[in-house]
A protein has these predicted regions:
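Membrane-water interface signatures at transmembrane helix termini and the short loops
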Residues: 2-10, 143-210
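Membrane-interface transmembrane helices that cradle and orient dolichyl/undecaprenyl
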Residues: 18-32, 62-65
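Transmembrane alpha-helices and membrane-interface helical segments
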Residues: 19-26, 54-58, 157-158, 199-220
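Membrane-interfacial loop-to-transmembrane alpha-helix junctions, especially the N-terminal start
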Residues: 29-33, 70-74, 165-176, 194, ...
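Membrane-interface alpha helices of multi-pass inner-membrane proteins
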Residues: 31-56, 182
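Perimembrane helix-loop-helix junctions
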Residues: 50-79
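Membrane-lumen/periplasm interface segments of specific transmembrane helices
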Residues: 70-156
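Signature aromatic-anchored transmembrane alpha helix within multi-pass, membrane-resident enzymes
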Residues: 75-79, 215-243
Length: 243
């Protein structure tokens, strides 16, 4: 059924992520990943593709190191959430169960089974998720979202390019955080929602690691062409109004 409390599911996801970042104790973060990430999976299964943000922030913060023992111990805390995600993916809802769910919603809450609930019949398996999207792909959609990502993420891309991460190369950082979005583009038709979630996670994560001084922004950024252009007040105002 649709879980539309507090607006959208992603509001809950973002709130949990902010709570996680506010935790100061590594043990508390371990408990969070073990016991609360499974809850996020039950709220919205694709959140598993954004676990990479947890991993990057934790690595920069020193929650784990790149060695066999530390990495295995850290990844072990994701097993409950990933196990639930795999179980859901490998056990799609049957037509009979879907009908019973729709009847239950109607009789007890007077709600119709629509949107995500309705799509469960045609997009319940992993294969169906990909297959249903193939006919939607065309040049116009690719161009549109390429420009949306380029313009929308442009300032963040510039910041990352001129940033020096304590433990990561910026190219590796970009690769790690952008990989999930391309997988979700192949699986989901609501690309606008994906971009919104991806952008919010990216901004929250970058601001957090900047606040914690895990990244240093070079003064060379002031020499960037786009930064120079936007420093002109009237151009910045026009750009702000348009976008």
């Amino acid at each position: 059924a649709e879980i539309e409390v507090l607006g959208r599911k992603e509001i809950i996801i973002f709130s949990f992520y902010l709570i996680y970042l506010s935790l100061q104790n590594f043990r508390q973060k371990n408990y969070f990943r073990i016991f609360l990430l499974p809850l996020l999976i039950l709220i919205w299964e694709p959140v598993v593709f954004f676990f990479i943000f947890w991993l990057i922030v934790d690595y920069l913060e020193g929650v784990f190191e790149i060695n066999y023992k530390s990495l295995i111990k850290y990844l072990f805390t994701f097993i409950p959430a990933i196990s639930i995600g795999i179980f859901i993916a490998l056990n799609p809802i049957s037509e009979i169960d879907h009908r019973n769910m729709a009847i239950f919603l109607k009789e007890n809450f007077n709600e119709e089974c629509y949107m995500s609930c309705g799509l469960l019949l045609s997009k319940s398996s992993i294969y169906d998720q990909f297959k249903a999207n193939f006919n939607l792909f065309n040049f116009e959609i690719f161009l549109r979202y390429f420009l949306i990502i380029l313009i929308g993420f442009g300032p963040l891309f510039i910041l990352i390019k001129f940033s020096q991460f304590r433990k990561l190369n910026y190219k590796i950082f970009l690769f790690l955080v952008t990989l999930p979005i391309f997988i979700l583009f192949m699986m989901m038709s609501d690309w606008g929602r994906i971009v919104n979630i991806f952008y919010t996670f990216s901004i929250i994560s970058f601001l957090y690691i900047y606040k914690k001084k895990f990244v240093i922004i070079s003064n060379e950024i002031l020499e960037n062409f786009f930064i120079k252009v936007l420093n002109r007040k009237y151009i910045f105002t026009i750009f702000f109004i348009i976008f």
